[in-house]
């Protein structure tokens, strides 16, 4: 059996004070440790979604389209995709929003996920319904044990 070493995972350190923006979101959230996800979603809404919408309109063509697409691809797929995937994993395990604001979770799943290649509800169905139902053991087809 493998001996576990000292835990090196990052831990939450509460800031001395929250910004007004963070205080606004904390009213809707279950756990203040999920605030980095709000910051990530804000950046995605500013940098990724407007450009993606612009790329799918007939406003740009030819070289102008490509000049916008190349940085869009880098930002969305190289910079944000991994961060978004980690956030999606975490919010599937622990719902970030209070029950009466769960529509915000649905908004992320149904509106934001397609910008990163996820069809609505499929990540949750696979991850929680298939992967974790097998308890992530060796006989699980999507086991992560060999990578630990």
Task: Label the model's feature ranges.
Residues 1-87, 91-148:
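Non-catalytic, topology-defining segments of multipass membrane proteins
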């Amino acid at each position: 059996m493998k001996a576990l070493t000292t835990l090196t995972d990052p831990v939450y350190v509460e800031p001395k004070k929250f910004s007004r923006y963070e205080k606004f979101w904390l009213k809707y959230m279950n756990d203040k440790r999920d605030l980095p996800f709000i910051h990530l979603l804000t950046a995605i809404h500013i940098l990724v979604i407007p450009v993606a919408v612009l790329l799918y309109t007939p406003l740009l063509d030819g070289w102008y389209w490509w000049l916008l697409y190349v940085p869009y691809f880098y930002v969305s797929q190289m910079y944000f995709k991994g961060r978004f995937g980690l956030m999606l994993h975490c919010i599937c395990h622990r719902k970030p929003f209070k029950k009466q604001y769960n529509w915000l979770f649905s908004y992320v799943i149904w509106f934001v996920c397609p910008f990163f290649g996820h069809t609505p509800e499929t990540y949750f169905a696979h991850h929680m319904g298939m992967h974790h139902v097998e308890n992530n053991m060796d006989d699980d087809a999507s086991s992560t044990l060999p990578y630990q």
